[in-house]
Amino acid sequence: MKTTRLIVGCIAILVLSGLIGTAVSAQAATPITAQTEPGDPLDPRTYEPGSRPFLSLHATGVQRYACQANGTWLFSDPVADLYTQDGTGKPVGSHYLNFTTGRPVWEFQDGSTVEAARRVTVSGGAGNIASLLLQAVVTTAGDDGDRLVKTTWVQRLNPSGGVAPDGACTPGNTIAVPYSTDYVFWASKASSEDE
């Protein structure tokens, strides 16, 4: 009788463990929800039906500008840390400019990167940099993984700050303007089906 109870108890524990494990796996596999709709100029599905978002990161950093000889600010490059949207506060990557190509790069903690070219620009509102849709040009696997390799599109959404100040500047000066935004990484239908 004790043996039967012990076996039943062990089976119950295994079943519950399996259910708990399944619940955790399901939670971890929850898909990223698109913040835009097909037809929206910032939505990749407008140009490539079947695309889906697979990663959403929050960025905080600066947009750097250099003052030109004519006394106006010219955008130089972004420098930002990337964070998951779960509120843990741990950086998982970085965002910067490839000075050779002039294109923005996102690098995940596994070393994988995506470099993209701007396709659509929409005003981010007064005092904010623009919202963007960028198309991947080059992706590379990192030494520790390939999280960003399947990226075909990158959205820059919900921008705050980052705009150069109004008015004249002293030639040769530089300025770093704080900004934050969300970057959403999209994969094509073909790479979505490969998973």
Where are each of the predicted segments found?
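Primary mode marks residue(s) on the alpha4-beta5-alpha5 output face of response regulator receiver
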Residues: 28-64, 71-195
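Secretory targeting and sorting signals
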Residues: 2-28
